[in-house]
From Swiss-Prot:
It is a multi-pass membrane protein. The keyword Cell membrane applies. Belongs to the Casparian strip membrane proteins (CASP) family. This is CASP-like protein 1F2. Keywords: Cell membrane, Membrane, Transmembrane, Transmembrane helix. It is found in: Cell membrane. Disulfide bonds: none annotated. Homodimer and heterodimers. GO terms for cellular component: plasma membrane. Residues 49-77, 135-156 are extracellular.
Length: 189
């Protein structure tokens, strides 16, 4: 009987299941660590790029300076990226320390990743909308495109938004992985 349980991946003599260290579980752990690190790196880079986005132009001998902090959507993006970056660092530490494969950890990780994903998605959407109007204008509302005058600022803002979107995609993948593990473990939400 004991040999049958060992062949099935369980060891009753030790009272320990080998399923927690099986290759699929280890693959999940590695993918999770890599995606959390990428989320941390991309949102950190997005913050750095957006905060340094500044340009001064002269119109009719009057000097104007454009900064990310003048636009509420860009401030929201930086704030959301800071929250996502910080909590990604904490979750990376949490996952590394508490890698036990317990299903209740999957639920907390799922919930954590879901909240961060929604926050990131809303900030990216707001910044993308403002960036689109800045680049192309809105003729029917008589809003002029301004990126022709502040090209460097607009390019940096675009780069920051793209980096934030990559961070969002990493969070989306983490959410799917955590939901899948909840389902596989039999602890559906």
């Amino acid at each position: 009987m004991e040999s049958l349980e060992v062949a099935n991946g369980k060891s009753s003599a030790l009272g320990v299941s080998r399923e927690a260290s099986s290759p699929p579980q280890m693959g999940f752990f590695i993918a999770q660590v890599v995606l959390r690190f990428f989320t941390l790196a991309f949102t950190g880079a997005a913050i750095a790029v957006m905060v340094t986005a500044k340009e001064t132009v002269e119109v009719f001998s009057i000097s104007f300076t454009v900064r990310y902090s003048y636009l509420s959507a860009f401030k929201f993006l930086v704030g959301a990226d800071a929250v996502v970056c910080g909590f990604s660092m904490l979750s990376l530490i949490f996952v590394s320390i508490f890698n036990k494969g317990k299903s209740n950890h999957y639920f907390f990780l799922y919930f954590h990743d879901l909240i961060l994903m929604v926050l990131s998605m809303s900030a990216c959407a707001a910044a993308t909308a403002v960036g689109y109007v800045g680049r192309y204008g809105q003729d029917k509302a008589a809003w002029m495109a301004v990126c022709g005058n502040v090209k460097m600022f607009c390019d940096k803002a675009l780069a920051s938004i793209l980096l934030s979107l990559i961070g969002f995609i990493c969070l989306f993948l983490l959410t799917i992985m955590a939901a899948r593990n909840l389902r596989v473990s039999g602890h559906l939400i």
